[in-house]
Regions:
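Catalytic domains of carbohydrate-active enzymes that cleave complex glycans
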Residues: 6-10, 14-22, 28-63, 205-257
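Secondary-structure boundary elements
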Residues: 17-21, 27-150, 186, 240-241
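N-terminal low-complexity, Pro/Thr/Ser-rich intrinsically disordered segments
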Residues: 1-4
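Hydrophobic/aromatic-rich core segments of domains that either
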Residues: 106-107, 111-113, 117-119, 123-124, ...
């Protein structure tokens, strides 16, 4: 990922007209965000994503930014990278913003900070949506509505769900994980949200009214920096020299970290 706009349009091939339609029809105050999104989305999305989807995604993300105190304080860099994207890794593309905003904005609209909002969301959304953790989930990399339909998800699917709910209400959020703990006891995924700095939490694992507390803290503290096996990675659509190692697709190296 990571192209200039002209290169992205070339990669789009026969879908170029859809991207140009999105660029030409986006409101002026959203044009920088649309250009960033098209320049940074996965190459495979450039080839089949619709203008209608892009315009809706961009508009709803900006609406959430404008309607929340924390959203209005965000830099463009944080907003573009951790609120505007419609996906985290390789999960199915879904239109979740309207549904999640309508469901969960009323829950957090009076929160004093994004920190406080995320604490509330992590306590309530999984019961509200009827999703639990289970190793019997259909697949690891479920998109939100796939997890809702199944009623269950892995830590990966739960994290994707919490991140997308956070983004729907203007909270910068990102997918974090390790391919393998230092003691070879397994992998794990979790969520980081921005409130002046990055804070972590386990999806569907609330710890009272606090972030930065979890059962996996000690394991995470022993991760090996720079190791593609024992390291910790945060997914991003920014240009980087690293990729996010996905256990469910071990040979795919297209998502940045």
């Amino acid at each position: 990922m990571g192209n200039d706009l002209d290169s992205a349009l070339q990669i789009a091939g026969e879908n170029r007209s859809e991207l140009e339609k999105a660029i030409n029809n986006v409101p002026k105050d959203q044009s920088k965000g649309m250009a960033w999104l098209i320049s940074h989305m996965p190459d495979e999305d450039l080839k089949d994503i619709s203008a209608e989807f892009l315009l809706s995604n961009c508009d709803l993300a900006h609406e959430a930014r404008n309607n929340t105190s924390w959203g209005r304080e965000l830099s463009d860099e944080l907003f573009f990278t951790y609120v505007l994207p419609y996906a985290n890794l390789n999960e199915k593309i879904e239109s979740w913003r309207t549904d999640f905003y309508n469901k969960f904005y009323p829950m957090v609209k009076n929160a004093r900070s994004s920190y406080e909002a995320v604490v509330m969301l992590n306590k309530k959304i999984f019961d509200e949506l009827g999703v639990i953790y289970s190793t019997k989930r259909p697949k690891a990399d479920q998109a939100p509505y796939e997890s809702i339909a199944a009623g269950m998800a892995s830590c990966t699917g739960l994290s994707i769900l919490l991140i997308d709910v956070c983004r729907s209400v203007g909270i910068p959020a990102r997918f974090v994980g390790t391919p393998l703990w230092h003691n070879n006891s397994g992998n794990h995924s979790w969520v980081e949200i921005w409130d002046g700095e990055w804070h972590f939490t386990g999806a569907a694992e609330p710890t009272d009214d606090k972030l930065n507390q979890s059962w996996f803290q000690e394991l995470a503290s022993k991760a090996t920096e720079g190791s593609n096996t024992y390291g910790i990675f945060a997914a991003t659509w920014e240009d980087t020299d690293n990729y996010f190692p996905m256990n469910w697709l071990p040979n795919v190296k297209i998502h940045n970290a």
